[in-house]
């Protein structure tokens, strides 16, 4: 039975995988599903933040080499990826800025896959690495059902305000204007002291993966790939 390791950006995503995504995917035949913060164990930042690609690639490649029966994937925020030229730059990140919004995440995902395949050589099965890049923060997914989001965090009166934010965008995955209006910043403005890992996970469990998949096409495509891999 296959094993899945999800390389995540921060503690919020790590908790999401362990509490919400893994229980769903176990029903498709995985033997083990775990999350690992990007970078090596000595330098992990449990508050999030993306390391340079060279370091992350080494982590992913080592995992794929050490366990021939595993699948690797990522869960990272596009806007947090280093784009500057040099060893920290993530493949496809600068190119993606020249693409229409719907193509930006897939541009980076394809570049990451190509780089991993190049590193591992011709004998590597590319289906063993499924990169996933969220256009914005994890909190964007929570706007898939604003009423349940507000209820889950104990602020039911905020449902209307959350919905007003959601209605300004085509999908929850597009909620952002700049660094000051990222999804988490919008939530924190309405919920002082918002605790991302705890409240975010409570909201995800209340909203449910089915609703998020319905509202967030990139997320849906990723989960469907993970489901199909073991079928």
Question: Where are the regions a protein language model picked out?
Answer:
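Charged, often glycine-rich, active-site loop that binds/positions anionic groups
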Residues: 43-55
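Catalytic nucleophile-elbow at a beta strand-turn-alpha helix junction centered on a G-D-S/GDSL motif
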Residues: 6-15
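C-terminal accessory helical subdomains adjacent to catalytic cores in phosphodiester-
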Residues: 1, 14-43, 57-231
